[in-house]
Amino acid sequence: MEYEIKPIFWDEVEPECETYDEAFLASLRAELKERETNGAKAASILLDPRFYSGKGNFWACGEKKDASLFESFTAAMLHAARRIKDCAAIAGFMLPDFQSDWEDLARSGLEDSCVESFKAAFAKKHGHYEFVRRR
């Protein structure tokens, strides 16, 4: 199946540490619901979780990109998933980009365990989501 890829940036979901931008998430949900109304096929969109959009100062940019920071990233994406759980157009998520966003983890050999923890975080309440590796 061909998917439409929609980027979702951590700094838009959680612009300050442990503070989620509910207005952004409501806007994302409204956009996805509108697309459903306008004919988007069910399970046709994959969200592409990215680290930083490049806009403004992002609190996590100065942090070491380690497993602990990746857990915070995962929590933010899980929070976003809760806000859009009723959007039928969402098929799931691309797996995080370990070649550019999380290169330190990839070099440390932690990519596979981080991927598994990312998927496991979603399994309990979002088991219907697909997870697709980058090519």
Question: PLM features: what roles do these ranges have?
Answer:
Residues 2-58, 62, 111-130:
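Aromatic-lined substrate-binding rim segments of carbohydrate-active enzymes
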Residues 67-135:
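Active-site region of glycoside hydrolase catalytic domains
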